[in-house]
């Protein structure tokens, strides 16, 4: 018996509602169900058409006035007890999420759970939420890696319909999957080396030995390295573009966009240098060239093509924009509050460097992020107390969203590793053969037809081959058994 359940005997004048839930039949007073009109059973009594009734139950018998529900009959006892007592108790034998789904189906809010079960229910729900988060993340990683692998296989199938499809397919696989074969690994290592060489050359070019009063000095060695790197980047992008199965999808890939952006500054600088000789506005052209040269730093993003960690970081930031937004919001509020407070107590001290609110913004930023350069600091006692509070609040504010972001990064990192493992096999996986199609109705009809034919072959005439009367079949079986017995006796 359900905890708190009691027997309710309807009055003689009360109309009963017949319920059949998974084979468990119960008659309930209408007044009992109407105590909670917003639940499923309460809404059922307000329906005025059969269509409306069938939207709330699985079936309805007009003759018996009985409502059928294909739900858990054991849990329905708890639901029925809720209508009698007004309190819902948790079914211990049922999973907490299944229980939640069941009461949601019946339209019962969790707020009706009695106090004796509420705390235990919430604890089990939170505990299962944590377990479900880990399991769901692993399942999502596996499922997503399988889906992306399936997308990659579909892209490979497109090459069969393209011109020079097999050649383009081989090139595409080696360019996209560094672990596919030895040649693919060599291409990936070469590309990574060129990216690192380009970054090193850019950093060396900024040293004082390569600077003069007019600007940078064109060193022939560094210039040769730059041209060689750009030639490699351009050739790599061109090969990927030519071998791609779909041009539109190619330009939607962020990694391909990064490859294109990384070579734009070089060619734009060449164009500006060419026009600089013909243009009179040399100063403005020089600034444009400097800006374009600074854009070469975007080449470091090309490492994302060869780094699982960078791709995971990008996916984490893309899917954690809510947490990142909260982090920025918390920091902005804290910086605004503490900058005004520190300014109000430090402005009258002539030895303090916190003389304006914008300067206090900088101080509050490096204090809340626990960087603490030391270039600006409070000198008064009240200012130091405010600074201590600012640092403590900064630690708490930054730590809260960072934990969530770190957990997501771990999951996406594992997902990217699963994708790389799935795509590193030398031979694409074979397609699973399609399962044979069987029509059970046709098979049954063929068996019945064969049975009727066998009856005719032994001298039994079936008057109506399409008849499905069970009595006629039994009579035929008796005749068939009698004929068989006579044959055996004769032998």
Curated annotation (Swiss-Prot):
Protein name: Delayed-rectifier potassium channel regulatory subunit KCNS3
Classification of source organism: Eukaryota, Metazoa, Chordata, Craniata, Vertebrata
Intramembrane-annotated stretches: 358-369, 370-377
Keyword Ion transport among UniProt keywords: yes
Membrane topology (Cytoplasmic): 1-182, 244-254, 307-321, 414-491
Family: Belongs to the potassium channel family. S (TC 1.A.1.2) subfamily. Kv9.3/KCNS3 sub-subfamily.
GO biological process, one term: action potential
Transmembrane segments: 183-204, 221-243, 255-275, 286-306, 322-343, 385-413
């Amino acid at each position: 018996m359900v905890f708190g359940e009691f027997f309710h005997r309807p009055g003689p004048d009360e109309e009963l509602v017949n319920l059949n839930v998974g084979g468990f039949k119960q008659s309930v007073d209408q007044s009992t169900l109407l105590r909670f009109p917003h639940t499923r059973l309460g809404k059922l009594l307000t329906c005025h058409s059969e269509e409306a009734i069938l939207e709330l139950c699985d079936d309805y018998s007009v003759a018996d006035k009985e409502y059928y529900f294909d739900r858990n009959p054991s849990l329905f006892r708890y639901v029925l007890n809720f209508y009698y007592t007004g309190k819902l108790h948790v079914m211990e034998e049922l999973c907490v999420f299944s229980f939640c789904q069941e009461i949601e189906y019946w339209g019962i809010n969790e707020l009706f759970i009695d106090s004796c079960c509420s705390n235990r229910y919430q604890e089990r729900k939170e505990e299962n939420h944590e377990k479900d988060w880990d399991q769901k993340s692993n399942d999502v990683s596996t499922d997503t890696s399988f889906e992306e692998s399936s997308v990659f296989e579909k892209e490979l199938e497109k090459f069969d319909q393209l011109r020079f499809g097999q050649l383009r397919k081989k090139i595409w696989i080696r360019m996209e999957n560094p672990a596919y074969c030895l040649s693919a690994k060599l291409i990936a290592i070469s590309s990574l080396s060129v990216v690192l060489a380009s970054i090193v050359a850019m950093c060396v070019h900024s040293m004082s030995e390569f600077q003069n009063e007019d600007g940078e000095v064109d060193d022939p060695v560094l210039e040769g390295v730059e041209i060689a790197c750009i030639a490699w980047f351009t050739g790599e992008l061109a090969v990927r573009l030519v071998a791609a199965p779909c041009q539109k999808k190619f330009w939607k890939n962020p990694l391909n966009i990064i490859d294109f952006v990384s070579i734009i500054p070089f060619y734009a600088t060449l164009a500006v240098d060419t026009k600089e000789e013909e243009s009179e506005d040399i100063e403005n052209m020089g600034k444009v060239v400097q800006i374009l040269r600074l854009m070469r730093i975007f080449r470091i993003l090309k490492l994302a093509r060869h780094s699982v960690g960078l791709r995971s970081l990008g996916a984490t930031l893309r899917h954690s924009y809510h947490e990142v937004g909260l982090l920025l919001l918390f920091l902005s509020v804290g910086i605004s509050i503490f900058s005004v407070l520190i300014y109000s107590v430090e402005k009258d001290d002539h030895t303090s460097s916190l003389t304006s609110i914008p300067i206090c913004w900088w101080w509050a930023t490096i204090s809340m992020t626990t960087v603490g350069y030391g270039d600006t600091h409070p000198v008064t006692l009240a200012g130091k107390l405010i600074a201590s509070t600012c640092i403590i609040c900064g630690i708490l504010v930054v730590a809260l969203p960072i934990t969530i972001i770190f957990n997501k990064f771990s999951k996406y990192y594992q997902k990217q590793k699963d994708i790389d493992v799935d795509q590193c096999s030398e031979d694409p996986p074979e397609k699973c053969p399609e399962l044979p199609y069987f029509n059970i109705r046709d098979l049954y009809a063929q068996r019945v037809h064969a049975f009727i034919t066998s009856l005719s072959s032994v001298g039994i005439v079936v008057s109506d081959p399409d008849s499905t009367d069970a009595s006629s079949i039994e009579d035929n079986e008796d005749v068939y058994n009698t004929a068989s017995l006579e044959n055996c006796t004769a032998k």
